[in-house]
Amino acid sequence: MSRHHSRFERDYRIGWDRREWSVNGTHGATSVCSVTSGAGGSTASSLSARPGLLPLPVVPSRLPTPATAPAPCTTGSSEAITSLVVSSASAATTKAPGISKADNQSQGLTTSIRWGQTPVNQSTPWDTDEPPSKQMRESDNPGTGPWVTTVAAGNQPSLITHSYGVTQPPTFSPAVNVQAPVIGVTPSLPPHVGPQLPLIPGHYSLPQPPSQPLSSVVVNMPAQALYASPQPLAVSTLPGVGQVSRPGPTPVGNGHMAGPLLPPPPPAQPSAALPSSVPATNGPPTTDSAHGLQMLRTIGVGKYEFTDPGHPKEMLKELNQQRRAKAFTDLKIVVEGREFEVHQNVLASCSLYFKDLIQRSVQDSSQSSREKLELVLSNLQADVLELLLEFVYTGSLVIDSANAKTLLEAASKFQFHTFCKVCVSFLEKQLTASNCLGVLAMAEAMQCSELYHMAKAFALQIFPEVAAQEEILSISKDDFIAYVSNDSLNTKAEELVYETVIKWIKKDPATRAQYAAELLAAVRLPFIHPSYLLNVVDNEELIKSSEACRDLVNEAKRYHMLPHARQEMQTPRTRPRLSAGVAEVIVLVGGRQMVGMTQRSLVAVTCWNPQNNKWYPLASLPFYDREFFSVVSAGDNIYLSGGMESGVTLADVWCYMSLLDNWNLVSRMTVPRCRHNSLVYDGKIYTLGGLGVAGNVDHVERYDTITNQWEAVAPLPKAVHSAAATVCGGKIYVFGGVNEAGRAAGVLQSYVPQTNTWSFIESPMIDNKYAPAVTLNGFVFILGGAYARATTIYDPEKGNIKAGPNMNHSRQFCSAVVLDGKIYATGGIVSSEGPALGNMEAYEPTTNTWTLLPHMPCPVFRHGCVVIKKYIQSG
């Protein structure tokens, strides 16, 4: 049972069941209620002094006692009536503040009325054991203002009027009228006991305040229609300030207020006197404001800042009216014979072109300063200028598809930058397959880069739809070639590009046939299907009549017929378009696989496309049992160097041609090696250290892929193998590795290619071996090694080393790459006995965490891993 329910059961249940109540709030075995009239008073007697029903809240001492007339009181009936009748003349004879508490007591409740929680008061339950009359003691709210009133409830059908006299405020205040909400009083009973009396509501409404000040504030509360409860008003203490909306307190059934009692108003600030039309606080907008919302903000003692947000709009409106009336204008613009009179300052504030033009004209003009400046403009339509001026003076303008291009051209020419952005935003939403090329040409002519890039990307993305429009047949030759030769042209079949070229030529063959070879070179003929090439392209009359066109077709035929010779046919026409399936992929090259306690070599080469999370097989390695090699990507090709096969250390260099999907032996290193590192710097491949025929080698050489030549550079200060190497900040770094004694080499070696010099530092923090290193966001990450999950991070700028987040698995002989701002660690082996790992995990620098990814085709270690752009055929 709740706290107030238990108190009810303890103190009030017996008396309630007996219905023995007295008019003054006490109860006993028997009760008699009598009222004796007196001169403005009444007397109530009782046979028992035992506490009874709780009275209504006591009016604080600051509120005088209302003068009451005799009222009948009946007992033994559920229709109890309490009435306080006050004449309008009695307000003048009320007592002043300071009367005794005995004179300021409430008449209480009549028979059969009890305190309790009603639905009206569910938001303010009792929080103490004190009854409401004690909770509302005068000492509890010493500063309560005269808004607290005493309310009596009854069901008398006649009009019940309550009038109270309030002391004269220190300064003049208009009359305040308060309309109280519905008041309900019901007993608080357990759920199984129904209420003994119906809800007794009291409904009050107030008339409008008088227009003249009163000598004292009088609150008149005649009974009105049901549920009329407008927001009460409170009087502001600021002199000269009208009524201010204030949420007044509302008494409810248990003596609590529906809203908190407001503190006394602050003392008057003489310096803050404002007209009644100006709000006194940062409240809601007033209907009296000329410009809508006005704000008054306190910025110090006696200081206020007034802000009118509608002021700029009103000023522009007035300036526009002056422009239309040609009042106070000082600039005349003549366009196509029409004269436009404007204000120089207004126009110069919106247009850099006119600002500079006006400044130069004023400096060069010999006219009197009182004469209007006159500008004559050509290459501009008068209607367009009128629309621009309308925007300058109002900040608004209607744009449609008919005038958008013209307005953008004029706004761009006269440097109305704000209006240019509006036009660009509008045209971006209006782009279609039928107008995107025209918008692209217009944006390029106006040097509007934002619109140009938007239109270009849009046109490239929907090429099949654009190719079906008439607009593409009307663009210039240069624009057409630039469009169809773009690598980002989104087409599933190169045959469509060829057909579009032929249509463009045949639109005006007399003029355009001479460009047939130049146009045909923009088509990727090697990617056209051989049957289409032989049956359609070869039989086209435009092709037959041009020797240059026939050469291009023959090149495509050789590409299909001689796949082994494709390496010598590297031209822009043999490069696939990006939309044709080219993606940046992670390639796994060879490696070792655990089969029980034995190992076997892998020749498979696979790639993973992160866009669709799929694995694709590539051309296998041309050798079988090779390990400890090194791979690196240069461009879109993969170079594999060195390694060991059947106990023999090798110097071979093989190249995987991404476009041709095959492996070729391209060169040999000057020093055979395995367990070495290779990387690319400035387009050249560097091979570092490793294990040679006679042990560790310190030899370093670089390979030029264009000239196919090797060149030796400065050797390593410390000969190591199985180290971690990467490029960062223009330097080549080699971390740790295995020294000649077969132990971890705690050394960091760095090489500067520009000066061909090495430097090194020894540190116990560097103890990695059989671990890869990658560069991300200016930091070097060393992953795993020695069967560990650790991640070591090196900062080249500060020269310090710190530990990073651990990987999910211990990885030795793993490989790592960087793709799309993430680090990918692939494969590896957990321990010398295995098992090999068949998964990847990615490092996200924003969250500094590692995440496991789907499994690879098979568990692998001692493999190569690189990133290239690869053409993935659909399906």
Curated annotation (Swiss-Prot):
CDD domains in the cross-refs: BACK_KLHL29_KBTBD9 (cd18468)
Record bears the keyword Repeat: yes
PROSITE patterns: BTB
Region (Disordered): 113-145, 240-291
Transmembrane segment boundaries: none
Pfam families xrefs: BACK (PF07707), BTB (PF00651), Kelch_1 (PF01344), Kelch_KLHDC2_KLHL20_DRC7 (PF24681)
Ranges of biased composition (kind: Low complexity): 270-280
Basic and acidic residues bias spans: 131-140
Name the UniProt record assigns to this protein: Kelch-like protein 29
Organism of this sequence: Mus musculus (Mouse)
Name of the gene this protein is made from: Klhl29
